[in-house]
Design a protein with these regions (language model features):
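C-terminal active-site subregion of NodB/CE4 polysaccharide deacetylases
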Residues: 2-109, 116, 144-166, 174, ...
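A short acidic, amphipathic alpha-helical/loop segment
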Residues: 120-124, 234, 295-299
Length: 412
């Protein structure tokens, strides 16, 4: 597994060097600009900006992390690549034809409201005069709570460290899907967790966390110290300096796995909380896990939102749908060269989407049919999803079921 990653990194770094120094990068950027309707609109997404990447890597989900130094260099690279660092509103206006951009646009976004963003990203953005928007799951703001993905990552690492063998009979049924590949060595904790979270609603994740904590014997060491979230005073301070905030549900909820009443509550109460606490109008939304559906978009459109951002790594096009904005999710290793150090050539090629032009990337679709999980049966939860929308799946839809991204098992 590690050898394959190193080989892929080496191939990509070598290709980036050739593209960058041969002048092909400029031609590819021009091609993407033409494809996008005359202006590129790049939206980049970050989660946690940290002071010590290597140290934090030992206890946190790697793909959420970027060092403050690398983050600063990304902003410098975007500027050097000819992008105007703009707001989400500017991007929507250009896409809708209400504004003509003189340059390509790059929008900086943050998901989840981690306190690291306030500590380490905010000072850099302020110093460089770069606008940004942070999407907040409001039930976590000004609390000591941690996200389910951070709690699960922490617990799974404890399971590994203790060489603990869980009692599956007393765990919710879907736990085997999460733990099996990790304990067998087929997947890393991060990879298994990433696959699992997108397939199961919040209540399943919470039940697995509670059951694992009980089996591991409880104790303070089962709750991660890292991953703390901003408080409202910090949010207000950033807002006073012109930084924007959008809604990201109440409880970091993957909405395509929830019934309609939950979707509406998660969206509207998140929006209202920010407006009440910060005194701003909230018009922008980020889909948790990057997943959205027609049903979710209808709720946003009917309630004063102007945009929704996905995690689909694809070009945004002039005239495109502002509720399916594409984003490039970035972290530290996004810029890692062949020798494991920062590569300006690789970063520039990534920002210019050279690998997308060459067909070397495989974007994950964010549009999903709208499902909820089957109800609890006894003390066991079925992981088979139930379609909310009555229409059958089409060839363009990605239908998720247990342990597969292409098939569906209907609940009885």
């Amino acid at each position: 597994m590690a050898t394959g990653k190193v080989l892929r990194r080496a191939v990509k770094a070598a290709a980036a060097g050739m593209i960058h120094y041969s002048g092909m990068r400029r031609a590819m950027a021009a091609y993407r600009r033409s494809q996008s309707g005359g202006r590129r609109i790049l939206i980049v997404s970050y989660h946690r900006v940290v002071s010590d990447f290597t140290g934090e890597l030992q206890r946190s989900i790697p793909g959420l992390l970027i060092s403050q130094e690398t983050f600063r260099r990304h902003l410098e690279e975007a500027h050097a690549a000819g992008f105007e660092l703009a707001s989400i509103g500017d991007a929507v206006d250009v896409m809708n034809g209400r504004r003509v951009a003189k340059k390509d646009l790059c929008v900086v976004t943050f998901d989840d409201g981690y306190r690291d963003v306030y500590r380490y990203a905010y000072p850099v953005l302020k110093e460089m005069g770069v606008p940004a928007i942070t999407y907040l799951p409001t039930a976590f703001i000004s609390t000591d709570k941690r996200f389910n993905h951070d709690r699960l990552f922490h617990l799974l690492r404890r399971v590994q460290e203790r060489r603990f063998r869980p009692l599956y009979d007393s765990l919710p049924a879907p736990a085997l899907q999460l733990l099996g590949p990790i304990l067998s060595g087929q997947k890393t904790v991060s990879a298994s967790l990433d696959d699992f979270i997108g397939e199961h609603p919040t209540r399943v994740l919470t039940e697995i966390i509670d059951a694992l904590e009980q089996q591991l014997g409880g104790g303070a060491d089962l709750v991660p110290e890292q991953g703390d979230i901003m408080n409202w005073d910090e949010v207000r301070r950033m807002a006073r300096d012109g930084f924007e905030f959008g809604a990201h549900t109440l409880g970091h909820t993957v909405l395509t796995l929830e019934p309609q009443e939950v979707v509406e509550r998660e969206i509207l109460e998140s929006k209202r909380a920010i407006e009440r606490e910060v005194g701003i109008t909230v018009r922008d939304f980020a889909y948790c896990n990057g997943w959205y559906s027609d049903e979710v978009i209808r709720v946003l459109s009917a309630n004063g939102f102007r945009s929704g951002v996905t995690t689909e790594d694809l070009p945004n096009r002039i005239g495109g749908d502002p509720f399916t904005l594409k984003r490039k999710v970035l972290w530290e290793n996004f810029s890692l060269g062949m020798l494991g150090d920062y590569s300006s050539a690789l970063t520039g090629c990534q920002l210019d989407d050279c690998f997308g032009v060459l067909g070397m990337s495989s974007p994950v679709p964010g549009k999903r049919p709208h499902f909820i999980s089957a109800p609890t049966v006894g003390n066991q939860l079925s992981s088979a999803p139930v379609r909310v929308s009555p229409k059958p799946a089409t060839s363009n839809e990605i239908v998720l079921g247990p342990e597969t991204a292409t098939t569906i098992q209907e609940a009885p």
